[in-house]
């Protein structure tokens, strides 16, 4: 190819020459940190299964702090948090905890200052505190010093009284920590009348709050706050479903405020449904059908169908086609993955979910990259993907649809006896894509073939994605070598993602090449990882 880069010449300033004389994308410590913040591993593999976090997983983070770049690390933590770039929340909170325990004073100060921004809900704050406790011994440092006490106090004080009341009554405790613990240990001095009421409620209980404030002249805000706390207390004590419904409607109480017994009432569920967020609604469809909240033709079914057909609502809730597809397949099955819950799916809801699946393609933001997807079409793709209710072939078909419908330049190929084009058009349904996949005679899933095929056919691609079960057979050419050859010939700094959807672990990605990523399993968080990797965020 005329004008193509020699393999010994980097395609971009981010590439370096490796030990074999080929060019790879250098993995810097900042790149490793970003991977860790996104999915909890500094290496080139995303695992669906929860990985235990420890200092041994965060060597690049430690090196950056030791090199005097701790404040840059905090900036990365904040931007990952604010822009929602994390597939899992824990690595972000772990990294913040490490920074807050380190020896560098500037990093520590920046970490504590970032606590209210990064720990947006109490669950995050409790997790951060627990990580600090876990790290105390290995990092040989104290914990409840003045800096942490101030950070925790600021977390409460920077919110209004009503905002704190809403979150502390919804997220009461996690990881062995409660609000009462944090208020006691932080020696909080409330910054407002509203906060004084809430902190007294947490530490002393409703009875003392009621006694102290019943005769006092209060602001409108404080009155509203007391009424809300009274409603939260009332709902805990009442067995009367009508009163529960009234309190839900008047004070926007949510499921977390209710007792288990309240949730046995279908009328209570009907009240909760009115303001239920879409993500919670998708999660609870089976339960609400099983307990007869949703019955053929009733107004609740109509409400759900209406919400699922509302494009603005779907976009605002950031519902991805995958979220809907998982809800659809779970609901269609008529039973949960675990437990004894069973239901008969409502046909109108099934239709609404099916329609919402196609509607949500419009809400996916394109990356503007050229994709080449390579799909394993073997019978073993009918196994369930790790971390999902979907089988591997359904995940692959849906991903082909997502890319075809959102990216202007994309191609799909299938592993037959050789690589063959597998046209997926924007008007195809999921079933049509699956049927077409079944008609392709299956061949070996040699992960180097997509790059070899693209090089032979002069197909330009920024990102190659292989979808397979756990068959990641490497032929005569290693995928890393095929990718480097493709970069050299086409003069494109292309990337490769291999999704082994039923695999517990495999290694194809060159750990020293930032343009390669392995994925073991496939869950909804995997979508964020793919997007971040494609857009060069990680």
UniProtKB/Swiss-Prot annotation:
Keywords: Acetylation, Cilium biogenesis/degradation, Cytoplasm, Metal-binding, Phosphoprotein, Repeat, Ribonucleoprotein, RNA-binding. Highest in brain, followed by lung, muscle, kidney and heart. Lower levels are found in testis, liver and spleen. PROSITE patterns: TROVE (PS50988). The modification Phosphoserine is found at residues 4, 19. The modification N6-acetyllysine is found at residue 224. The modification N-acetylmethionine is found at residue 1. Residues 16-369 form the TROVE domain. One of its GO terms (biological process) is smoothened signaling pathway. CDD domains: vWFA. It is found in: Cytoplasm. Residues 361-538 are annotated as: VWFA-like domain. Disruption phenotype: Cilia absent or reduced, virtually no cilia of the normal 5 uM mean length. Residues 120-284 are annotated as: RNA-binding. A divalent metal cation binds at residues 378, 380, 445. One of its GO terms (cellular component) is cytoplasm. Gene3D superfamilies: von Willebrand factor, type A domain (3.40.50.410). Its main location: cytoplasm. Identified in a IGF2BP1-dependent mRNP granule complex containing untranslated mRNAs. Found in a complex with PUF60 and Y5 RNA. Interacts with RAB11FIP5. This is RNA-binding protein Ro60. It comes from Mus musculus (Mouse). The lineage of its organism: Eukaryota, Metazoa, Chordata, Craniata, Vertebrata.
